Every structure is written in structure tokens, then in C-alpha cells.
Amino acid sequence: MAFHNRRWNFTFSCCVVVLLLPLVAARPQQPSAATRVHEEYSTFRVENTEWTFNHLAVDHRNGNVYLGAVNRIYKLSPGLDIQVSHQTGPDEDNRNCYPPRIVQPCSEPLTLTNNVNKMLLMDYRENRLLACGSLYQGICKLLRLDDLFKLGEPFHKKEHYLSGVNESGSVFGVIVSYGDASPDKLFVATAVDGRPEYFPTISSRKLTRNSEEDGMFAYVFHDEFVASMIKIPSDTFTVVPDFDIYYVYGFSSGNFVYFLTLQPEMGGGPTTGSSSAGREQVYTSKLVRLCKDDTAFNSYVEVPLGCVKGGVEYRLLQAAYLSKAGTILARSLGIGPDDDILYAVFSKGQKRRPKESSQESALCVFTLKEINERIKDRLQSCYKGEGTLDLAWLKVKDISCSSALLTIDDNFCGLDMNAPLGVSEMVRGIPLFSESKDKMTSVIAYVYKNHSLAFVGTRGGRLKKIRVDGPTYGALQYETIQVVDNGPILRDMAFSSDQHFLYVMSESQLTRVPVEACEQYSSCNECLGSGDPHCGWCVLHSMCTRKEKCERSSEPRRFASNIKQCVRLSVHPNNISVSQYSVMLVLEAHNVPELSAGVNCTFEDLAEMDGLVEGNRITCSSPAEKEVPRIIVDQGDHQIVQLYLKSKETGLAFANTSFVFYNCSVHKSCLSCVGSPYQCHWCKYRHTCTHDPSSCSFQEGRVKQPEECPQLLPADRILVPVNVVKPITLRAKNLPQPQSGQRGYECVLTIQGVEQRVPALRFNSSSVQCQNTSYMYDGMEMSSLPVDLTVIWNGDFSIDNPAQNKVHLYKCDARRESCGLCLKADPLFGCVWCKGENRCSLKQHCSYPQSMWLEHNGINSKCTHPRITKITPLRGPREGGTLVTIRGENLGLEFSEIKDHVKVADVECTPVPEGYIPAEQIVCEMGKAERSQFAGNVQVCVGECRPEFMAKSSKYYYFVIPQLLSLKPSRGPISGGTIVNITGGNLDAGSNVSIMFKDQKCTYQRRGGQWITCRSHASMQGYGNVSVSVYVDKAHIHKDLKFEYVEDPTITKLEPEWSIFSGNTPLTVSGTNLDIIHTPLIRAKYKNLETINICQVLSPTTMQCMAPELPYSISKHKDVPERPDEFGFILDNVQSVLALNNTNFVYYPNPVFEPLSVSGVQELKPGSPIILKGRNFLPPTPGGNGKLNYTVLIGDKPCALTVSDTQLLCESPNLTGRHKVLARVGGIEFSPGVVHITSDSPLSSTAVISIAGAGGLLIFFIVIVLIAYKRKSRESDLTLKRLQMQMDNLESRVALECKEAFAELQTDIHELTSDLDGAGIPFLDYRTYTMRVLFPGIEEHPVLRDLEVPGYRQEQVEKGLKLFGQLINNKVFLLSFIRTLESQRGFSMRDRGNVASLIMTVLQSKLEYATDVLKHLLSDLIDKNLESKNHPKLLLRRTESVAEKMLTNWFTFLLYKFLKECAGEPLFSLFCAIKQQMEKGPIDSITGEARYSLSEDKLIRQQIDYKTLVVNCMHPDNEKSPEVQVKVLNCDTVSQVKEKILDAIYKNVPYSHRPKASDMDLEWRQGRVVRVILQDEDVTTKIEADWKRLNMLSHYQVTDNAVVALVPKQVTAYNSVNNSTVSRTSASKYENMIKYTGSPDSLRSRTPMITPDLESGVKVWHLVKNHEHGDQKEGDRGSKMVSEIYLTRLLATKGTLQKFVDDLFETIFSTAHRGSALPLAIKYMFDFLDEQADKHNIHDPHVRHTWKSNCLPLRFWVNVIKNPQFVFDIHKSSITDACLSVVAQTFMDSCSTSEHRLGKDSPSNKLLYAKDIPSYKSWVERYYSDISKMPAISDQDMNAYLAEQSRMHMNEFNTMSSLSEIYSYIGKYTEEIVSALEQDDGARKQRLAYKLEQVVAFMSLES
């Protein structure tokens, strides 16, 4: 082929490249095929986005292409290279200027107007092109075809103005020839755009030979009565104001000219009158016919066209094309092959929506013959006087037909009577093909080898190729290709002159597409099965092509054109074993041409050999031994290899078949061996599988059939109770008898991963028994455990178990804590409820007589004492219908037992069989309650209502009345998808809720007590209001709520239409109705990945969006722009904007920055500009105005920028020193390095010289002195040298330390963020969390336990406490009680905190009341604070009152959800980051000091050499699981290593659920035998002087990649601690002591370990000897270094952790973060403080700020930050604690309003964050200001929220125990409290003192 030598520069459509990739890969030996398709696709794109393409014409004589566009006409070569272009616009114009301004001046304002090309016609006779535009009322140019030279442009007469309409697709012209003698005529039809008086809608014009002649475009005939034109009467516009006729296609055939139109219907249907009344206009498609010779247009006839497929009407014409029928289609239609047929594309229905939402369309075919017959029939009936003229738009009123005696033949051209005429009955086309996803928009067709082929363009830019064989055979869509990037494809399509190519056009590109792409099919079946009539199979070249392109295709069987002619190949034998070599194979080939040139046989890439051809048989041999494929166990037992026949003539494979190599020895069981499809035999006694029967004799037990295999037979469930000795007998067949030297049978049971082997006995060939043994499994979580059972013999020969029999081990008492659950167990288990022991056990294990048993079907089979544990819901409507779920114990075993025995609040509740779980759960449906019923408990009787069979709930079920208040938003799009929030009361009652918008459901989503949300559906009723009602079970709640469906939002414009790959550039979006969408999103889809970004609505017509990023890894991008596959918006459910068709959105490559310099540091003088180099800084947008919004920060100061494509010039701000440079653009942030700005020397040259001179003199003087000194003393000289060396040494180490610190800072940040992967966050449950905050350090607090009172006093005490509880719930009493306690001297700070916490535990279930009391107490506190003339800022600073601790507790209760959903994550990340960063360096296990620290006190100030090791640790729970790699340091103590290993293995396990390091020993495993236990102290521990150093890994010389294991602690004295040292018992005692103090610090942070051992006086150390022991000898000073130098490490650590600290602060100090709204409690309390400040006339913002800071950040957050163990299940070490304290201090400083003056003497932790605190302060101020701007929370909303919180945590604490604890204070201060109550008026009225005395009496009464 000659193609691949040329170079082509065409831009190809992407889809073709994709299409071809598999092809190129599959057949590399034929590059030309791919190249050819590549070069056949060529594309011409718009030069300017405004100059969109309109029309297309191809010169069929030479193939040149003419393209009409906005403002341009182009002449292109057949390959779409541009040859000439002719400019047609833009020009000054106004559409209202008639006649246009080029004829006479116009008073309208003129603007530069584009010229749309509306018509492009080839006038072959005169070799010219007619190009009509939209400028100047639609004048036309005549251009010479060769060079587009303008031959003429008539514009001065009114017939020169075709129409002012500026749509390109509503005008059509047909040039008609009348033989050589007469000139041609032009029939032109156009839409008139509401100006019927100026423009005829259809007319015939003269085409003069001379293009400049006066008569050009004159009407063919014109006098005062008649003209060759038709105008639309103005009356028509009074009926349908926007009436117009749109012309879609036109052609001439025979004696007639035809036009296809789309026009509004005039009928008296619903559309009569103004279409603006909201009704949609109905359209109809019609064909118009005129005689060619008719000058008066009497022959005008109109016929409606349409198409019906599958009951769906398609009536809106989109495109049409006239073609010949072709033999096959003609035969099917009953016409001649050369008859004309008309293809037409219609879309569904008759309503033309602005952006037609329906994508459904159909391709239909009409025969012209039938249309003409139908017109002839109508003409005949009309001239008989039947019916009316039926042309409503032209005649407006009905006119009857007049009769006349005429013969009407096929060519009748009408008279001036009965004309023009309309046919009322629609001509139905034959539907060929329909499409519902991608609307068809254009069609063209031709006949190839008798086949009719239609090519259809679609809205999505695709081309469908359809073979049309007619109604009997149907239509086959055989290929679809993506031709243009952005659809739709326009109506004009054209074939090249040789019909090998098709020109397809969208508004922005014209593409040449080959009509066939046969090369894409790589096999004969694919090629001939494709349905493309162009394609056939060229056999020996093994390619799909047209016949004329296949060499010697006329010879027999060399070219296949039918799928039956494809080559078929078979081989015998078609499989062999891998151990057989060079076997002769016979291949039989069918449909092959003669193969005289010879063939080769090829086994893929294994082997190739000559084949011997005899007729159609070919003989080959199989591969030799070294070429046979190796088959390994993983691949199965065989490998399929393709066997190819290669022609020696072409060198190509032309036929292939599958050949199998199999390997029997892969099979390890008899059944799989003999069940293999290959010849495999099983050797029973050798337990092997072979293909060779001779290698396994009959004596060796050869097996061929599955029935003969040794195997276990299916058994019923094998049940074995645990710990019961029992044999297991199994049925089998063909069990082999072990031969001499072979071992006997065993059963292998794998229980929880552990293998248990049991000897077994073979009774005979059909039975085997596992001997008496008992079995056991761990845990009580499973009541039964299926266990795999394998029977083996001779050690490892397993017997097949095809039924996969399992042994079921079971425990009666597991998961059967109640009688009901016990009796529910499988009867075969034999479990009984042992009443005496109150447990479920086997009969034989119950030590009581049988009368004390309950068993399933025994005499006693009914459980007593049913119990109800839970009821949901607890509230419902009176109307009933609520499904109440009752959970409990012993709730019957049969449904019949409880069927009629359930009452809820005294209302019958009918149990539902489906919801019944025996013994555990009843679901019943509530009946209707009376008005008088309000609440009651739930009562269930089992069988009979005797006390022992009856259960009553402790909780009540309440009847409530749900109510509706309002809904928001009250309107949404007609397409639905709006999230509607309905507010009201009691909306969480009942079990089922549904929301109706009139007759339509609104999909329920969530609900709470006062709200329900649902998602609206698309409206069925159209626009307007619908009433909203809610059903809660059977209650129908109705209020006059309305939801309005309004028109869907539309998107009209995007600016700009580009972004960069990383997105996040601002876009302005214009459209309509945008404000009805609450959360609009913008989306992009690329390569099946989707990204979204947010939008903000600014007004109903505009919104601002951030561009989504291109969803594709940036690294895969070359530097080329990309277009997303889809780009659009998610606006609720509005489908029309999901993927915009009218946008050309482009993504340009991201800007790329280069580093500032190789070292990353650039030296600069002040004022010098900083130049950032790179590329893509200015996106190459079409208008060239693509600007990105860059920000460049030097340090934290922005700089002014000048941007070019490769440089950013930054005017550096007035700074000196080192500063990081940071560039931001879109979604990218990049730091090209650091600038170092050094200031110039301020000294003058004279000063410099004089200083230098003075310096010189000084040096001279020093030298003299030194010489003198040297002479004086040699000794001091030596000392000096020694000092000098030490100084050098010190200096180099300082430098090294600084350099290390810097390097660590740079690398650690990255490592840390990548290491902290999303481990689950171990949140504590609500109860544990609140207890840790309320009662810190107390593990088992009484409020968690039941009240402990001696039995004889219990009733008395409970009565007393209930009374006391009522008093606590009395506000007067409670306030008086608290005030009295606070006024007592003995009432300590600790007591205050305790009382506040106890009161809050009692009031947990009544938070509204608690809040009210708290507000009173706080108000008192503020009054007291201001009265005592304290500084108002001190308010709430310290916990000196009950109120302050109550406030902390209040926040503790109400911020749990916020912690869990929002703030917990960054807090946990910070904790993990600190822990991880600390552990990367050495930590002294005794002093708690660390190399990495935020706290100066906990910083190791020495240089410690250490190395990181990786140890491989066995999993303690499962040694078989893979080893875990753990990073440790060689200077870690053994305990530290154990902790690190536990952290790694139990990474996602909460701390309390892990094994403790102290319970485990660390074993170092060296090889299989040697195991050394490593310990902190043992006999090998080194003791120097009186210091003993703990053992580290380096002490044991543990190597990198050593294998270690954690094993439970050994009791033996194996390398145990020497007695003279700190013994293990004393250490563990010490650990226990710490455990109960509740302190978070680790054992190591305590100094006691350093105190010398009393007996031996030995002190223990690890890395540094404690500073207090200043016993280092003077000689050691040489190794010391200035300790302050190590403070740089604080900075390194701070830098590493900065991101985590920022994240935490940002979360806490933002009003809406991570999807969680601001907790109501914060807003409510801040508003309360503001009210109090207003009340006391405090207007100082600092005071208000301080109150808020003291109230929330200091009271709650600081506590949580310092003590993350209050929130998470974790362990906090002393070094972590020290770092968190620094963070907490920074947090406190950020909340303060006072300025901190810092100097070099300030503490390091203040200096560390000094630079960050100002920005944190601004966050805090913004946070407080945002909160104050938020709308106030009403008391009603707050109370609802508090009630909800109370309900959620109702039973967390034991109220009785709490009351008892509070009562202890009453006992202590009885007299004082009673007297305070007697003095208070309110208390006297309520006789509270008397009531308290009653309580005291009850509590002290000794009965």
C-alpha cells in the first residue's frame, strides 16, 4: 500500500484511535491497515468559536467541498485542506431595518452583526455557488466555484430579500432544470420570523445566466392577482402569534418539487388562542408538493407525515434524504430498484420543547409513489366536491371543495379552484429503527451492491451505520462511531465523489469519515458477522477488506463474502498429555484456497514446524520435549494453546484452532482425577493421578470411574457437644486397606485454625470411626461451630469428602442466656433449661432431677417469667397502625402463645407473624385508641395471663398528636430532587411515615421530633402548587401546606469555558431559575471517572462555581488540552443540565513551576524581584485572554505579580532573612524553594578602610602579645591547643546537629502525613466519656452501679431517695441547696466539683431543667463577680463554684456528637502524630525525655547515637499469619519495643482490648531452635559504679530484620532479674498503684525508679543519667555540648506537627466544618452571655470575648486537648502529655485578648508558637463574630434539642445511686439547709423544709 510513506497533518477524531488500538496490537505485521484508516479521517475545525458551521455542499464532479459558516464561505479539498475562504461578515446591521441600510438609511441603532449562512446551493450549469446569509434581510451572493470570486450580490429589490430569519436550519432551496433551452429556476422556502408581509414563505425565482443581471431572483411570474409565491396571511398570526413554517429538506423528482416542513397546528384543540397561555404548542410535519412548471402555485398540496413504532408516535421531523431504493429494499417495499424513496428522522410526540428533553427518535422510510398516490386520491375526492380544502394556516376558515368534471392523472398541476389543498390524513412511514438515548439529527443514504445503507448522525456527535433491508427483514445498525467531539451532527451530510467517504459536520468541526472501516475486524467471523456489506474476508492475507482491495480475490475460496465461507479447522487428536512428545497430528481444513505454496503449523510461541499438505488434510507433529508448556498447580490441569496454520505465500496465519496440553499429576484427589475430561487414572494405593494406565497396575488400585473412588458418603448433621467424649462414625465406600508399611486411618478436625488429629478405625471398606475424644472451641460468641473434617490414612493420603461433611461442635449455654433461647435451640442438640442452676445445659450436665428441667417437647416446656427489655417506638398516634417492636426474654415459643395476648397502653395490639422471633421479639400492630387514653405500659401474656406468664414493661408507651407547621423550601424544579424539610411536632412518633405531594409520594429520608425530610419526585401534574400531607401510620396529618413546582433551571452560559487540570478556578454560570436549587454542584466526567465541585447561587440567573478537576491522574497527562466526556451540573434531579451539549469546555495543562535554584535557596538583595519560572502560566485560550488567579506568598506576605506564559515576576515585599516561597493557583499549591534576602552593608568605603586598618593594627598587636605569651609559657600553649581542638569539635557537632534538625524537618512532615492512614478512631462510648470528664480518675463510680443498701433497709431508703429526687427536681429547693452548700466553709473545691457532677448525672434525663438551673446559677455568679468588684475578665476562669463545673459538664453532655462527627478526627490525628513523631527518636524510658518534643522540659539535651531497625514480629494470636514489620530503635528498652510491637499489631484495636506489655515476654528467635527471652533487666545487665543501665536492643546485639515474638509471660526464672536489683514484683506493684490513680502518665515518668535501691544503693538509668545526680566527672565535660543548641529540635518537631495542630484549631474554631453544623449548645450559651453583658451594661468587647473563652475553650476544649483519653480508648505517655500541654497552652493563648510581650527569656513553649498565635487569634475572633451573626435559637428549639439529647442517653447513670451520693451532703449540713429553706419565702410556701425532714427521717430510720 502506498499510504504509509506520506506524512499527513490531520487532526483525527479520538474515538477512531481508540477503536484501532486493539487492531494494531493484534496484528503488528500489517501496519498499513491502521495507517490507512488514520489518514482517511481528516478534520477541519472552526477558526473562531463564533464562526460556527451551517451548510455543506460537495461538487460531485471533482470532490471539492464547500462549507457555509457564520461570516465565512470556505472551499476545501476532498481531504479538507483549505483552498480559498470568502468573508461574508460581520457587518453593521439591524434586523428591523427594512429595506436594509445598504438600500436606504435606517433610523434603528446599528451593531456589528454576524452573517449566518442559511442556504448553500451548487449551480452546476453556471459553475457558481449560491450562498444566502442572514444579513440585510437575507440577501444572497453568487460565487465562482473555482476561487469563490463574487460574481454578483443583488440587494436593491424586495425580491432579493429572502427572509430576515437568522437560523441556519429553517430555509431550503431547490434548483430545477428544464433542459438546455430554458434557464434554471430556484424554488426557495423559508421561515418568515413573524414578518409575512415582507417575505413569501415559498416562492419560485429566476436564475439568470448573468449573475449581475437585474432579473436575478425575480419571481417567475408576478401580476397584481397572482404570483409564483405563497405568503402566510396575517390572520394566522392572530390565532397563533408565533406561527412559522420551518423547512427541513427539499428535492425535485419527476415533474414535482417537494419540501418537508415542520409547522404549528392550527386546529381548534387546546392550543387555540395564544400559545403563551402556558399551553405547549402542538406541531405537525408536512410534505409540500408543487409542479415544476406551476407559475401560479395552484398545484400546492400539503400532506402530513409521521411514523408509528411500537405504539409510539413520532411526528416531529428532524431531517430527511431522498435516495434510490436498491434491489433488496425495493423487493421488500414492492417497488422498482430505481424508484425514489424518502428517509426521514422524526423525534417522539408533537411538542417541540425549547431544549427538547426527549432523546427518543425514529428513522422511517416513505416511498414517493405512495405519497403521490395519496395526493392523487385527495385531488380526485376534492374535485368531486367532498370535504374542505383543509389548509387552516392559509385559509384560516374552512372552505369546501368545489366539484368539477375532470380527469386527474399523475401529473395534474391544479386549477385556480380547489387550490391550494391540504390532505388531512397522515401518510405513515415504515419505521426502520428507533433510538431512545441519543437523538438522531441527520440522515443520508446510498445503495452499495444492492444493499440500501443509511448513515444517521446523532445529537451526541455519533454516526450510526444502518443496513436497511426493508420491513420484512428489518434494519440492522452494524456500527456506531464517534465522529465529532461535541454534537449534535447537523442535517447537511454529503458523500465524496467516489462515495468512499462521508462528510459529517457539527457546529465546530467538519470530518471526513470512510464509509466502511473493515480493517477493524480481526477475524473472519467478526468481519462477516458485522453486517457491513462492504466487508469481506481476504483469506490468505487474513484481513477484512473490500473485495477490490484483496489480491487475486476472483480465485476460488480466496475471498469470503458469506460467514459460511470462513475457514474451519479441526485437529485430531485435539489434546495430549504434557509428558507426550512429537505426536503426529492430523488437521482438516474446510473452505481453504489451494495451498501449493505450503504451510507451517505454529503452536503460539512454543514451536513452529512444516506441515505436509494432502488435499484439505495437513499433517504436523506436536512440540518436542523442551517446547511443551509447563503446567503448574495454580493453572488447573490443562493449558489451551492456539494452533495456527501459516501460509508460506503470505507469511500470515490464516486459520487456527484450540489445542490442549493436560497434566494429570496436578490432581491430588481421586474424584478430581477421574472426573477430569482428559484420560486420567487414579492409583489408589500410591495416591497419585496419571495419564498412562500402564504406570498403574490393577494391583496398585487403578480407578477409572468416580463411583470406584474411596470417598465419604453424605451424612446427616454430625452433632458433637463440647467437652463430651464421643466417637464419630462415618459411612464411606471403597476405603483402601493400608498395605504393609502404610500407616492407618486418622480423623483431622480443624477447630478455629488449630488441627486436632484423632486416631480412627476402619471397620470395613464402607465404614470408619473417629475414636472416643472430646472437642473444645474458644469463646461463647457462637452456639455451634461447623468444623472441617478430613479422614486421612498413611499420614497424608486424604479420603475424598464430596459432600463436604462437617462436624458441628456445640455448646448449650453459648448465646442462650434465657430459658426461651434455650428451648428454641435445635431439638437434636438435647439442650434443657436447668431451673436449679438457671442455665442451659445438656441433660446429663444438669445436676437437678428431671422435674427441675424444662425441655422443648417435654412435660415442662413452658418458660416462666417473661420479661420486656425494649420497646420501639415509645410514641405513636391514637389512630393506630403503628408497628410496635417488643424485645425481651421468654416471649413464648409459638406464635399462637402470644397471638391475642398483647396490649400496649391498654389498647389491643395485634401481633404480626412475620415480625415474631420466638422467645425474643414480638411485632404488633396498634389498634385505635380512645381520646381519653394517653399512656400506659406494654403487657404480654404467654399462653395464659397468670402472673408467672405475664410481662409488663417498665417504660410507658405514649399517644401523641403529630402536627405540621411549615415546609422549606416551598418550591422546587418540576424534575424533582428537592430536599424538602417539613417542621412540626411529634413527627418522630409511630413506625412508618409517608409524605404525599397531592397524589405523588415524596421519598422519605430522615426525621426527628420536629422535622421530616423527603426528596421530591418529578411532577406528574406539571407546574403549580400541590398540597402537602403527611401520614404517620394511620394518622393523616393535614395542614394547608403547599409546595410549588416551577420550571426547571436552565444553564445558558458558562464563563470562561475553560479551566486547568486541577480545577478550582472560578466560573460564572448564567441561566434561569437557579435560586430554586439549594445545593447546586458542577460536575465533569472523563474516562468514566467523575468529579464534582461546589457552586454558590448569587441570583435567579447567576451562580459562581469552582471548576471541578479533570478526573484523571495528572501524571498521565501530556501537555495537551483535554475535553471532558461530559460537563454539566447536578441541580437536584434536573436531567437536562447533567451533561451540557452546548458547551465546549476545555481543560488546559496545569501550570508547572521550576525550583528557584538547584539547592532550593535563592540569594537576593532587598527590592530585587523574585522570578518564578515554569510553563503553562497562561492557558492558550481561543480569545487569548486566559488569565489565572495567582497568589504568591513570600513567608506569609503576598507580592504583586506580573504574569507571562513562562514567568511570574513577583515584586518582593520589604523583608529580609529566609522566607519560604509559596505559589497558589486553582487547586495547586507549590513551593519552589526559599529566598534568602540579605541587606547591603550600610558602611561607607572610608569607614570600611579605617575599620580594616584598625583591625589590622589590632591583629598585629595580638600577634605580638601572643609571641610574648608563647615565650612566657609553653604549658599554656598546650592548654590552648587542647581547648582549640575541643572548640572545633564542639563547633562541628553543633553544625551537624543543626543540619540534622533541618533535614528532619523537611522529611518528617511528608512521612508523617503519609503514615497516618485512616485507622479507625477508637471513640469511647457516651457513658465512659462522660464519667472520665465528670469524675476524673475514678474508675468504678457508684453512679454506674445499683444502689448498695442492706436488704432490710432497702424499701425505706428507696422511698426516701424518691422523695429526695422530687426535691432535686424542684428548682427552688435545688438553688437553695447549692447556695447553702457553697456558703459553708468546710465545703471544699473538690466537693463543689463532685456535687456539680452528681447533680448533672441525676438531671441527664431532664436537660431542659438542668439548663434552666445552670442559667440561674451563672446569672448569680455574674452578679456576685461584678458586686465584689473583681475584674469582670476573671469570670469563669477557675472552677470555684458549682455553676462553673456544671457548665463544663453541660458542654460535656451536649458536645459528644460534635466530638464524634467532627472534632474527634483531627484531635485523634494530632495525638497519633505526636505519638508517632516522639517514637521516631529515642525516648528515655525512665525520665520520659525524648529527642523529639514540643516541651523543653522533656527534651533530651545530649547527642545520642541510634539506629532504626525493622523487626519481624509473629502475630501473638496466630503464628501462621504473615509476620508484621515493626520499626524500632536499637536504643529502645525491651519494654519500649514490646509497646511498639503491640501498637503495630493491634493498630486498629482500642487500647483497653489489647494485651498489656507487662503480661508478655519478648522472644528473639534465631533459627528454629534458639529462642532468647529479652528483658529490661536480667543477669547480663551492666552495672558501672552505682549506675545500672536498662537493657536495650543494642545490648543484646539484635540485628536488623530479626524475627521476634510476643509470648505470654513465663513463670520460670529463665534469665530472670538478679535479686539485688529492682525486682519485678516491686515494679508491678508500682504499676498497679499508678493504674488506680487515674493519672494518664506512664510509669516511666515517675522518678521513684531513679531513687537508689535501698539494699544495694544502685541507681537505674536508660539514655541519660538524671540531672539531679551531678556526679559526672570533670573529665566527661568533653562530651558535653551547649544544651540550648538542641532547642532547634523543638522547632523541627513543631514544624512536623503544624498541619495537625492547624487542622484541630480550624475545626474547633469554624462554624460549619466537615459537614457538621455548629452545635446549638454553643450558640445558645454565647447568646446567654451576651444577654448578661447587655443586662449589666458591659460593652467592652474584650470582656465579652474573655467570658466566651473562659466558658467554652478553657472549660471544655483545653481539658479535652490535654486529656484525649477522656474521648478515645488510648494510652497517653508522659512525653505525649507534655506535648499536648504545649498545644493546650497555645490554644489558651489563642483565646486570650491580652498581648503577650515575648523576649529571649520567655519560656520556649510560648516562643515556639509565637508566630502562629496572631493568626489563631483572628480565627477565634472570626468564630465568635460568626456565631453572634447567626440567627438566635428560640427557647422552643433549644428545649426540643435538649429533650432529644435527654432521650438518647436516658439510662446511662443509676439515678438512685447518684441521689444517695448527693444525700451524703444533706446528712453533713442538714441543719444549715433546713434553716435556709425556712427563711426562703418560696420554699416556705411549698413546705420544702418539712419535705426534707421527711426524707431525712426515711433515710435515718432504723427499722
From Swiss-Prot:
TM region positions: 1247-1267
Topology feature Extracellular, residues: 27-1246
Subcellular location: Cell membrane
Broad class of where this protein is predominantly found: membrane
Glycosylation sites: N166, N450, N575, N600, N656, N663, N764, N772, N981, N992, N1025, N1141, N1189, N1214
Pfam families per UniProt: Plexin_cytopl, Plexin_RBD, PSI, PSI_PlexinA-B, Sema, TIG, TIG_2, TIG_plexin
Boundaries of every Sema domain copy: 27-515
Domain IPT/TIG, first and last residues per copy: 866-960, 962-1046, 1049-1148, 1151-1246
Disulfide bond annotation, renumbered to this chain: C97-C106, C132-C140, C291-C413, C307-C364, C382-C401, C518-C535, C524-C566, C527-C544, C538-C550, C601-C620
Keywords, ordered alphabetically: Cell membrane, Developmental protein, Disulfide bond, Glycoprotein, Membrane, Receptor, Repeat, Signal, Transmembrane, Transmembrane helix
Signal sequence segment: 1-26
InterPro entries, per the entry: Ig-like_fold (IPR013783), Ig_E-set (IPR014756), IPT_dom (IPR002909), Plexin (IPR031148), Plexin_cytoplasmic_RasGAP_dom (IPR013548), Plexin_RBD (IPR046800), Plexin_repeat (IPR002165), PSI (IPR016201)
Molecular function in Gene Ontology: semaphorin receptor activity
UniProt topology in membrane: Single-pass type I membrane protein
SUPFAM superfamilies assigned to the protein according to its UniProt record, in alphabetical order: E set domains (SSF81296), GTPase activation domain, GAP (SSF48350), Plexin repeat (SSF103575), Sema domain (SSF101912)
Keyword Cell membrane: yes
One GO term describing the cellular component: plasma membrane
Domain PSI: 517-567, 663-710, 811-864
Regions of this protein lying in the Cytoplasmic compartment: 1268-1903
GO annotation terms (biological process): axon guidance; axonal defasciculation; morphogenesis of a branching structure; regulation of cell migration; semaphorin-plexin signaling pathway; synapse assembly
Function statement: Involved in the development of primary sensory neurons especially in branching of the peripheral axons. Interacts with the SLIT2 signaling specifically to promote axonal branching of Rohon-Beard neurons and the trigeminal sensory ganglion neurons.
Similarity remark: Belongs to the plexin family.
Name of the molecule in the record: Plexin-A4
Organism phylogeny: Eukaryota, Metazoa, Chordata, Craniata, Vertebrata
Designated gene of the protein: plxna4
